[in-house]
Regions:
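Intrinsic low-complexity, intrinsically disordered or marginally ordered coil/linker segments
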Residues: 1-188
Length: 188
């Protein structure tokens, strides 16, 4: 899939609803025909298996079966989909199973980084910067400023705008470095 969005989900709800969803996803993870195409359309197959119509719901993509797990009463898994997080699919699953799905999605080709986890309970990161540290994800502006400062040599960084300017100045002299700096959008 070109322009793939990678999305992580944390699903909350009553245990029996979560286990029912997980079991169905486990069952559908093994293609009945053994075809790669069937596996790559697992979002579509989940909609069909629960009585929905895939032609009415944007559901192009698949979940990664090896990421499907329960941890501390939360169902966790990852999805690859075309272009963006499959919000119609998510809304359908939330309604069908009476659950709440929190997500973090990124599509770096278009610099789309989003979460609907406003409180940061499951996805606390609010900034993305792949310039220097081991992880490109940062929860606070202070963490981001420190990391940007280490790379650029700039001091007294305290806002995202300061960081953006410092990275821009740095890239002016280091054109060959593929550095991305972005705020993660919080949607509701």
């Amino acid at each position: 899939m070109a322009n793939i969005a990678y999305t992580e989900y944390a699903v909350e709800g009553q245990t029996d609803n979560l286990l029912r969803l997980k079991q169905l996803m486990d069952d559908l993870a093994v293609p009945s025909t053994g075809s790669d195409e069937e596996l790559s359309n697992s979002l579509d197959r989940l909609v069909t298996a629960t009585g929905g119509n895939p032609s009415e719901i944007e559901c192009r993509g698949f979940w990664k079966p090896f990421t499907l797990r329960m941890e501390n009463g939360i169902l966790l898994f990852e999805v690859e989909s075309k272009w963006v997080e499959p919000s119609q699919w998510r809304a359908f699953i939330e309604k069908t199973f009476n659950v709440r799905m929190f997500y973090y999605t990124e599509q770096l080709g278009e610099l789309i980084l989003k979460t609907n986890d406003a409180k940061g309970c499951h996805f606390p990161y609010r900034y993305y910067f792949n310039g220097s540290s081991d992880s490109p994800y940062f929860e606070t502006i202070d963490e981001l400023c420190e990391d940007v400062g280490e790379l650029t040599g700039e001091e007294d960084l305290s806002t995202f705008e300061d960081c953006s300017k410092a990275v821009s100045n740095y890239l002016h002299n280091h054109l060959d470095e593929p550095i991305i700096l972005s705020q993660i959008t919080v949607t509701i």
